[in-house]
Amino acid sequence: MDADELLRPRAGRSEAFFEIALLKDAFRFLKVMCPNSREKISLQFEAGQLVGLDGKKFPSTVAAIRELTERAGAFAIGRDIHVGDTIIGIKGRVGFEAPAPLIIIKAHHLLEKHVLTKHQLYWKQNIGDMYGTLLHEGQFLEPVMRNFETFLADTQGNVTGTVYVTLSPYQFMVTGMESKYDLMSS
């Protein structure tokens, strides 16, 4: 199938629908896996930062991310296609493979849901979205960004605990958490 054929709309579909899969070569972590394999792991967070995996502390968050990337990548976790708006106003489509970030985001969010109040979660989501938008638009030096950073950093003080995750081929599931700051246990 050539590139023109890939971009041609399929019969019976609107012109906006494209069925274009990324080539297997586009993925760095594609590995031969046992289809029935699973691995249970735990992620340790302190003040919102990933500090360990399976109880092992890492010298830096980057080192923990690298380890998680290798372990989750072996399951081909984290592949996706993102469609979004570019700064010049057109739609863009990008394929990516991000095993560790997707797991960390989901695990971190579960921990936040347990240790932050409803109002903290609401404002963190909204301020986080606005921060991301301004950053994407190149507005890092905008003074309000420092205000947002102060609020976001303040919310992370109690985001401390362990989150449990099960890795399976092409997917993962966050299965539980423990935190001394869990508002459900108070």
Spans of model-derived segments:
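Nucleotide-activated chemistry modules centered on ATP-dependent adenylation/adenylyltransferase
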Residues: 1-186
